[in-house]
UniProtKB/Swiss-Prot annotation:
It is found in: Host endoplasmic reticulum; Host endoplasmic reticulum-Golgi intermediate compartment. The lineage of its organism: Viruses, Varidnaviria, Bamfordvirae, Nucleocytoviricota, Pokkesviricetes. It is an enzyme of class 2 (transferase). This is Serine/threonine-protein kinase 2. ATP binds at residues 91-99, 115. Essential serine-protein kinase involved in the early stage of virion morphogenesis. Keywords: ATP-binding, Host endoplasmic reticulum, Kinase, Late protein, Nucleotide-binding, Phosphoprotein, Serine/threonine-protein kinase, Transferase.
Amino acid sequence: MKEINSLECQWESIDDNNDTTILGDDIYFDYIISQLDIHQNWSPDIRLIRYFRKFNKESFDKISDTEYINPSFFQQRDKRFYPLNDDFYHISTGGYGIVFKMDKYVVKFVYEPNKQYSPIDTTAEYTIPKFLYNNLKGDEKKLIVCAWAMGLNYKLTFLHRLYKRVLYMLLLIIQTIDNQRLNIHHFSHKYFLKSFNEKKSDIKFVKLLSYFYPIVVQSNINVINYFTHMFHFFEHEKRANYLYDRGNIIIFPLARFSSDKVTEQMAIELGFKSIVQYVKFIFLQISLLYIKIYELPCCDNFLHVDLKPDNILIFNSDCPITIKFKKYTYVFNEPIKACLNDFDFSQVANILNKKIKNSLKIEHNWYYDFHFFIHTLLRTYPEIESDKEFSDSLEDFIMCCTKNTCEKFRLKVSILHPISFLENLITKNIFSNWINGESC
């Protein structure tokens, strides 16, 4: 595939609704696809109910007392969790994707039910970071997460079928434990969520999952972790009539964690003096990335639209990162780097993103992103207030907020501050640890 370094990116159109296309390295993509059984089917629901009628609370107790426990069925936040093999482990589900970890890969499935978009209209998550990476000339390009491959217009019905199979299994297990009548089609969502959340960390319940998941689900896709997120996604009333038919599969490198997961203790272990110094590090790297993007010809319209700590991923950094800006040289000797991720709603230069047209009704620039970013930083890390100079500098981005100008941290009005506003901030003494190679 031709490198995406031109403002006039051209793509072959997909005329047939069933045609598929792979962007990027098809070796990565073919490997991931080879690990998925996208044609898997299960026996009818009535047979599943008949199977569970053979069990009762006493037989469940016997299984819990005697059977093997698979630690990968604990929740990932549980210290007892351990991935035993290279299965696909569910790590998140949001409004715009279902994400799994598999070995050194992150695999994201995105349903595209909106018929007004062609498959090519949904490629921003691959094309925009690739375009930026190919055009940025310095180490700032290392602060972008680029997908290794993206498959367009693939049939994803298997994932919804898998979710339903696991949901029904969990329902039948819970109903048996609670001495309830077995029923998978008429049940209380509130009852299921409450009961599952109460039981999911119990070792006896995890033993039941260890026993039944291989028998009932028979899949290398483990969705037990954060299953409630998947439940809320698929059962949401606004998706009641979705077909869950086709969408995209995106393959990324695996990060250590998202930036919002770092605690005070973790920050110190990473070599920072405090959590506030870590936040300064994150803020400075992302600010420099934006500034360097805005230096590119025709790129002064760049918008990410969802700039927040959990969309900034932390990767290992094997060598110092050096970024030059005017008379300043910023040097980062830290063992990590902060990389911008999730470009699904982004726009830059002449690479059109139809989704952003429906998302934003008025003109915005970088300030829209940073206004939202500062709000989310202050909410995630209230410790910032302990550093008055840093806190005051960030407050400048949100000091004029009212109900008429800002809703849920997002600007409702067009405020087109020049990028020099951000440039002046990063030259302040609060970032002296990294200016002109002074970091150690």
